[in-house]
Amino acid sequence: MNPFRCDGPTLVNFSGGRTSGYMLRRILDAHDGTLPADTHIVFTNTGVERRETLEFIAECADQWGADIVWLQRDGKSPAGRRFHRVSYDTAARCGEPFAELITERKFLPNAVMRFCTQALKIETARDFMRSQGYEHWTSVLGLRRDESRRVSNVRARAHDEWDVSCPLHDAGVTAAHVAEFWRVQPFDLRLKSYEGNCTMCFQKGRAKRERIAREHPEFVAWWAEQEQRVGGRFCAHESGYAAMLEHVRRLPLLPMDLDPQGDDGCTGGFCTDRRRSRRPLWCMCKRRPGQPHALACVLARDEMQHVGTTEGV
């Protein structure tokens, strides 16, 4: 059986990334370009998606003739119907849905309580499917064979209203297959692999966020504003987004900033696991809690207390 065929009410979760775009193409091909009436391709906009992501989604729709439903959470609507439909032209671009959610909750999401993904994406898409009259459906996620641990995690979570399908995983698709597909397409997502769809997602590794802050300092303002108005931190072990921006402005680009390894942030509505940063056993610098190792080395070096290199950090 073709894992990309849709049987019965189906929600195709389109994150706006290359992997979910590849999955959408395979699903369309499995149905000769015309999806069943009860199959819905849904993109849920948080308001802090990258401009390039929104353009890519619109281009997928135009190039492939796909009917993509654009949704945003609407906290003012009754429970169970907290969404409204938007389009490329009307989708929020200044974080409005996310900021509204933070105002309601009165605290910030974090690595332990990632209610941003739950409320802005999962529950918004769920409410849409309910509004179509479905009591049960299949939720299709863009998780690959090389993301087997994530596949196991999402399949282990029981849901009364939907079953989870991961056709890319079942078909043996890996990141290499996705990259090869987009290499020969007439259009592509105009983002680097480390950037991700969400401007400054706190699930990204610190090095990735610092690199993005160097390249796009304007992205930091919204995140810093939320921390300031709520009086909290997205990352409890860090000093905050405003301090991070000041840090990257003061310090030169370090080798660790270019390390492609690390966290991938939140993709397709599911967040990756945090990884522990590695600290060389030979390093004797005195790192304060929450302080990046490379920064501690630089400060120690500047104070002539420590001589070394950040290679291998």
Question: For the regions a protein language model found, what residue spans apply to each?
Answer:
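Nucleotide-activated chemistry modules centered on ATP-dependent adenylation/adenylyltransferase
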Residues: 1-313
